[in-house]
């Protein structure tokens, strides 16, 4: 069972909020879920630093994939643009 999961990399879809660094973008990934106790829909977001080889711009929707550590904070890379 564990062998099926091994080697699979996580992917997330988010919006580029900053592209001011060289070959690095900040991607905001939103998560919507129902609160277990209060049954209210909660919107939560996380920011990920991702390696940018595709030259995506601020405002683009992108798919990012987990990768080996590229720097102190970068552990994701941009795979493609999502329309």
Curated annotation (Swiss-Prot):
One Pfam family linked to the record: Ribosomal_S17
GO molecular-function terms, A-Z: rRNA binding; structural constituent of ribosome
Entries under InterPro entries matching the protein: NA-bd_OB-fold, Ribosomal_uS17, Ribosomal_uS17_bact/chlr, Ribosomal_uS17_CS
An example Gene Ontology biological process: translation
Keywords: Ribonucleoprotein, Ribosomal protein, RNA-binding, rRNA-binding
Keyword Ribonucleoprotein annotated: yes
GO terms under cellular component: cytosolic small ribosomal subunit
Annotated CDD domains: Ribosomal_uS17
Taxonomic superkingdom: Bacteria
Keyword Ribonucleoprotein: yes
Assembly information from the UniProt record: Part of the 30S ribosomal subunit.
Protein role: One of the primary rRNA binding proteins, it binds specifically to the 5'-end of 16S ribosomal RNA.
Family, per entry: Belongs to the universal ribosomal protein uS17 family.
Name assigned to this protein: Small ribosomal subunit protein uS17
Species of the source: Chlamydia muridarum (strain MoPn / Nigg)
